[in-house]
Amino acid sequence: MPHTVATPPPLLQVRGISKQFSGVVVLKSIDFTLQPGQVHALLGGNGAGKSTLMKIIAGILPPDTGVIEMNGQPCFNLTPAKAHQLGIYLVPQEPMLFANLSVQENILFRLPKHQADKKKMAQLLKNLGCHLDLSVSAGSLEVADQQLVEIMRGLMRDSRILILDEPTASLTPAETHRLFSQIRMLLQQGVGVVFISHKLPEIRQLADWVSVMRDGGIALSGSTADFSTEDMIQAMTPEAQKGALTDSQKLWLELPGNRRAQSRAQSQQPVIHVHDLSGEGFAHISFHVQAGEILGLAGVVGAGRTELAETLYGLRPASTGNVILEEVNITAMKTANRLAAGLVYLPEDRQASGLYLDAPLSWNVCALAHDRQGLWTQPAQEAAVLERYRRALNIKFSHLEQPVRTLSGGNQQKLLIAKCLEANPLLLIIDEPTRGVDVSARSDIYQLIRSIAEQQVAIIFISSDLEEVVQMADRVLVMHQGEINGALSGAAMNVDTIMHMAFGEHRSVSEPQSGTASSAENKGTSC
């Protein structure tokens, strides 16, 4: 009788996992498998259930039904500590570091002594190409560097199952390449990786297997090579809206009491004029933005884009230079006064800086108005405002008093945009608006930003995704090491040129300025 070799069990097997929140079904009898040395990509629209499933596997949430097995052995009553002991580690989409502890303390936090090896930490940092100061507080890092620290925490734990939730959302292409090299090294050691991403080219580059979630279930699963990009997109968003916002959505979206009177809408005077501005992380910055223009701000992490945005909003002091908003010098104004004057900032980190996670949705959407009007709230008015933006932006939620933290990432981002719009901006600074947002919600946000510009709002658009910068901007300023390395517009505005300029090459190409630029045909150039 021939001898048969038993097939080893999967590294991870999830069977029949279901979950409800307040009677709402978010996971429907999910089956999910991860083999040793495999990258299993998980795709899905915002609210599809990806994060809930991963939190159950990581012991953060208990399932209502179903079984989790690791190497063929059932895992009962999982907690985060127990999951870590078993070798399961979740790197969250939003960094969850201890802001007051140093980078090194965060990486080594609660590590067993046999794993808290500083030499190993130094080698891993070298492999990732990280040049972080380990002594600085984690709260002082940019989001991309915080993400790398979170990844380091997982790598230091010798995890057998590494769950990466949007790990490259804030990373540069070079940082992404180094991370992927490190992942491939782990795969050779038999580590299994669950890779959650909305970047389909990355999934094709890295993942052996792909599963697509929709409405709490698995809509598609199989070898990545067997599916086209269109197959994956259709499985995620079979009824996704395509094209521009509908007329009714635009009607709901119209800014309340638009600050820009019709008589001034055609003014050639810039909405904002920045002259020789210097501050922490940048120097000698000069540019202007017209009404209705989308000005892209590109550069690698550390180029000074976020520092510039925070200085324009008044969160950081300027050392020299002037900022003129609608012919008023606001350089010395406090943030509250800049907000009242019409300068609104949508920050990069929506959870840490943009939204009050434990406050109700209705309160959040009017939060900037609260800043101007005091703490007295008007629940009926807040409810009406939230309903208006729900219709305009397709925000999905169960009830008005629902805490923000219960929303999916894409719906949180839409709520943050609604909050900024309710402040009635003249100038809207948008920092990484689609970080961690799915394909469908990303398209919604693009159309939304264009619709805002059509209402003669000036927009500064900051993004690490160079393709979306080219797609969205009328002009692009490229920053390198805290300075503007050049301005691009028209045919010169392409990913390759921007990338070279972001790394210090001088390729600035501009066309004669055409004044207000609110469409692709009216792209200004002078900075």
UniProtKB/Swiss-Prot annotation:
SUPFAM superfamilies: P-loop containing nucleoside triphosphate hydrolases. Keywords: ATP-binding, Cell inner membrane, Cell membrane, Membrane, Nucleotide-binding, Repeat, Translocase, Transport. Residues 507-527 are annotated as: Disordered. Residues 510-527 have a biased composition (Polar residues). InterPro entries: AAA+_ATPase, ABC_carbohydrate_import_ATPase, ABC_transporter-like_ATP-bd, ABC_transporter-like_CS, P-loop_NTPase. Its EC number is 7.6.2.13. This is Autoinducer 2 import ATP-binding protein LsrA. It comes from Yersinia pseudotuberculosis serotype IB (strain PB1/+). The lineage of its organism: Bacteria, Pseudomonadati, Pseudomonadota, Gammaproteobacteria, Enterobacterales.
